[in-house]
Amino acid sequence: MGRRSSDTEEESRSKRKKKHRRRSSSSSSSDSRTYSRKKGGRKSRSKSRSWSRDLQPRSHSYDRRRRHRSSSSSSYGSRRKRSRSRSRGRGKSYRVQRSRSKSRTRRSRSRPRLRSHSRSSERSSHRRTRSRSRDRERRKGRDKEKREKEKDKGKDKELHNIKRGESGNIKAGLEHLPPAEQAKARLQLVLEAAAKADEALKAKERNEEEAKRRKEEDQATLVEQVKRVKEIEAIESDSFVQQTFRSSKEVKKSVEPSEVKQATSTSGPASAVADPPSTEKEIDPTSIPTAIKYQDDNSLAHPNLFIEKADAEEKWFKRLIALRQERLMGSPVA
């Protein structure tokens, strides 16, 4: 049983080897032909040797060698098949990764060379871009100036044409009229033009006056600001002493009677006798009202309703006379 199993194994191995040889011979047929032409003598010798070996009876050692070779070749074929199946199992992802790594290595190798060679070209291109940008800016500025000049010229032409058209229209409108009416119409036009010119001058004067007022107000505000800053500095200083408050109205009142006294001293003694010196009336703090007082007598009607008829008529006549005087003289009613 052991011999039969070994024979079957040997037969299967020999079959596999023959198949492998056929495949290898079909793939390398072209190479073998060229090689056979060059070295025909050697092939003939090897063939004769192989024929002699086949004719001779095979020994036991030869069979052993063949078995060993077939086993080694079969193990090599199985290894190759396994490696192929593994590579197929890896699939496209492995190939893509390998191609990417190769491309990266190529780029990394090629970059320093490009940098070393392209420094001068980068400088020249940078200079060119600078000069081009400057030229573009200059062209844009020139184009803007030309457009502005063309606009100004167009406006001047339009105004000139309008004036010419107005004068032509006036002449065409006055041709059919008699000379007296033409003179009147021209006078009216001249007066209208003068009125327009006066209005324009007045508007200019108003604008100038407003500008002056604004300047004066700004100056006044500046002076007030400076004064305020100085007062704040004086208050914040160490030498500041607190004083009682005095309103500006009281200061003005005290200044006015002093001026009156000076005028009386300059005038004669007769005026001094005629006009006695004015004395200020001191105001009592108790007389200053601190609250509003209402006159409520708990009455339902106004007291004027309880006046007699004659008194009411007299008051009404007096009111009418006052209103009439206001209308005639323009004086307000007291």
Swiss-Prot record:
Q: State where composition is biased (Basic residues).
A: 14-24, 35-50, 78-118
User: Coiled-coil segments, which residues?
Assistant: 180-236
> Which biological process terms from the Gene Ontology are attached to this UniProt entry?
alternative mRNA splicing, via spliceosome; mRNA splicing, via spliceosome; nucleocytoplasmic transport; response to antibiotic; RNA splicing
According to the UniProt entry, which residue ranges have a biased composition of type Basic and acidic residues? 1-13, 51-62, 132-166, 201-218, 247-259
Can you summarize the PTM annotation of this record? Phosphorylated.
- State the residue spans of region: Disordered: 1-179, 201-220, 243-290
Do you know which InterPro entries this protein is assigned to?
SRRP53
* Subunit-structure text: Interacts (via Arg/Ser-rich domain) with LUC7L3, RBM39 and RSF1.
Disorder association: Intellectual developmental disorder, autosomal recessive 70: A form of intellectual disability, a disorder characterized by significantly below average general intellectual functioning associated with impairments in adaptive behavior and manifested during the developmental period. MRT70 patients manifest impaired intellectual development, mild facial dysmorphism, febrile seizures, and behavioral abnormalities.
* Function (record text): Has a role in alternative splicing and transcription regulation. Involved in both constitutive and alternative pre-mRNA splicing. May have a role in the recognition of the 3' splice site during the second step of splicing.
Q: Report the protein name in the record.
A: Serine/Arginine-related protein 53
Please give the organism: Homo sapiens (Human)
What high-level taxonomic lineage is stated for the organism? Eukaryota, Metazoa, Chordata, Craniata, Vertebrata
